[in-house]
């Protein structure tokens, strides 16, 4: 009797310990797992998972403790998988002879059974009462479940209770049914399963209310749980239990595959977000006003053959936003003005402020608020050429800096308005002075030299090298001291290296366009040289390049002037009558010879602009001229003509000497410009012969039709071998001044 009382007291103590976690859960969130203790030793059963109809024999003990390897799952339940976790343990009831820790999903045997770890049958019930009503009566729940399943109360363990996520007024209770032996036999397991499935386990409805069985799992039971969950198969052919929602297994680890998928998905999501943000930022920048245009450096759009096609009708209809997107890579280092500022500066573009008008717009004189005088070019033609010219001119002028090039101060892009703001050159253009006023001889020479310097800079020293393509008298502006400035770069194109031409649609002004460009569309730097030669003839003759008021056959300046360059009488007839008695005939003849070569029909016979500059510097001594951007080693290496001594270097084919024979009765020292169709380096390796040395003073300026090369590091190849005062007899060089009034 005493032993029975002790046993009963021990059972009550164990039930109290079992109910303690549920009571303790009132103080903490119900989703937390119960705290478990660990023991230093544990003994495990090796359960036999093969189904057996016969009752299970008594468990056999192993003398040495061993662990059961984790079982691999094959089934699914609510799309979740379970694994045996070694760090999640179930505490076995304390007894006087057994202390051990079991690894889930195993649990310790009930009190009174040999120590070991077995598979429990996991049952999940949904009670229609609140959790706080369950905690005080967990012991009664164990008793009623045990009675309804024909088990001992010690075989029923309440593992957890929590409020239902969908209805807080209901309670989810997780129950473990533990076999007394190694496992439930199939008959017992099936019987328990059927009683729960058909709700034949009676529970006190007054205390627990109605209940639903949401999940049952145990190896050997049918593959479907009461709510349709499908179980897997454990090794040995038995279905393996899948996780019920209990406190003991809520903290399962996440598999490596799941972690990898989550990480990869996050990375892809980040990339998508970054790309979307970049696109949004880009479009916001494009949509900003013109004040957002900042300096940048990019290749010229004119280098692309299809530059004109970039302005489609749809792009033109989108206003300034389209242009801003096209100019996103343009080289802009200029100020941006608003349309209101320009309207105020030009009296709302008053006709009284018009300085001139070209093919693409008008130029207005403007006065800014700070007193700066500017020239505002308003593009008026509303077509694709307008925007193309605008971008071309901004690109060119923002990168070109030379004293003989007009300076771009700023731009304006607002709606459909396009404006270029230049420094104001007060003294008008060469055209206005030639045909509406007068220019003395010195001013004309100064203009010729300065304009040549500007073109030489474009062709040889700028980066990239530029072909102006619309050089004419109206595009050469004059300062008060008649210093010329080349303007209007709307048709400019980037020059290619070497002697290759650029195939392009013919653009320019009648009378100034080179014949090869007009006939074939092949554009070269020598095409600009031809245009310069026409302007030089204008300076000499005072006539327009095309004048329909002239007699028949004399409308074209070049056609009319060419035969007049052959003799003295022709030169006297050609020169502007307004210059009578104000010029030196020898200087005029030299300028005429330069002009004749510049407008030569053959491209290879035209000089380069750098050579024209050197020739003009020998004719016109510009004392006030300081060395500009174009100056290089070649400029400083040329001595003044008064210091020439010695003989001239050989010149077998001089481009100067290719001029027509001139006959006039006065000896004159002349310049011999040596032309070579090969590279510059070949000039110094050409054989010298006595017969090839002319007996006239002058300077050899080599010309070449080969590829363009940087001029800054070019060696000095001007050779002086004579005196300007010497006028020897004829030599073997063709078309040289003989001293007898003839060109040999």
Swiss-Prot record:
Entry-linked Gene3D superfamilies: Phosphorylase Kinase, domain 1 (3.30.200.20), Transferase(Phosphotransferase) domain 1 (1.10.510.10)
Sequence segments annotated as region (Disordered): 59-79, 681-705, 722-744
GO biological process: cell differentiation; plant epidermis development; plant organ formation; protein autophosphorylation; protoderm histogenesis
Catalytic activity: L-seryl-[protein] + ATP = O-phospho-L-seryl-[protein] + ADP + H(+); L-threonyl-[protein] + ATP = O-phospho-L-threonyl-[protein] + ADP + H(+)
Chief location bin: membrane
Molecular-function GO term, any one: protein serine/threonine kinase activity
Record domain Protein kinase: where: 349-619
Pfam families the record matches: ALE2_N, PK_Tyr_Ser-Thr
Top-rank EC class of the record's enzyme: transferase
Residue spans crossing the bilayer: 261-281
Membrane topology label: Single-pass type I membrane protein
PANTHER family: OS01G0750732 PROTEIN, RECEPTOR-LIKE SERINE_THREONINE-PROTEIN KINASE ALE2
Task performed by this protein: Required during the differentiation of the protoderm into shoots epidermis and cuticle.
The name this protein goes by in its record: Receptor-like serine/threonine-protein kinase ALE2
Native organism: Arabidopsis thaliana (Mouse-ear cress)
